Design a protein with these regions (language model features):
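Helix-turn-helix/homeodomain-like alpha-helical modules used for DNA recognition
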Residues: 1-24, 31-34
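Active-site catalytic pocket residues across diverse enzymes, especially alpha/beta-hydrolases
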Residues: 21-26, 42, 46
Length: 170
């Protein structure tokens, strides 16, 4: 993500770690998020504009979801979407547990020019109930370990670049 970019940041602890790294490394970002913790982390920067989506806050993780959230996200067109999900199957299916969160994530995908997916290795072949979409909707996958040969094949077939990310600094 370059300086001066606009971006969506989705729900999840992975996205909170990404937000902390952005704060350390990037300037003048415009961030729209449905993650109250990512908003809190990034709002510490006076050169950032941080916009929090409207909707219902989930007590468990501070995620904001619902119809109002989807409508809010659909008002924007950003440079990047940085997202995570609960599971990726070898056929490229992206899965999550909350259908309300999935609708918000789909709106983010549809309103971003470049889409990044960040997941740790535990998300590969992890089951979840709701289908978010296909990995082919993303431009690049960032993860902490090399994906399996089957997953690499799917990524290559869909034209999705992938990278093992450097560990998050503390």
């Amino acid at each position: 993500i370059p300086d001066n970019a606009s971006l969506f940041i989705s729900i999840g602890t992975t996205m909170e770690a990404v937000a902390a790294e952005l704060v350390r490394q990037r300037k003048n970002l415009r961030i729209i998020t449905n993650n109250i913790y990512a908003a809190s982390i990034t709002a510490a920067r006076t050169d950032y504009t941080v916009i929090i989506a409207s909707g219902v806050v989930r007590p468990l993780d501070g995620g904001i979801t619902g119809v109002a959230t989807v409508d809010f996200i659909n008002q924007f067109k950003v440079d990047y979407a940085i997202m995570s999900t609960h599971g990726i199957e070898n056929d490229g299916s992206l899965l999550d547990d909350d259908y309300k969160e999935v609708s918000v994530m789909q709106a983010m995908v549809n309103n971003a020019r470049v889409r990044y997916l960040g997941v740790d290795h535990s998300k590969f072949n992890s089951n979840a109930l709701v289908r978010l979409g296909d990995i082919g909707a993303f431009d690049k996958l960032f993860t902490d370990r090399t994906p399996s040969a089957a997953m690499q094949k799917t990524l290559n077939e869909r034209g999705v670049a992938w990278q093992v990310a450097d560990p998050v600094s503390k």
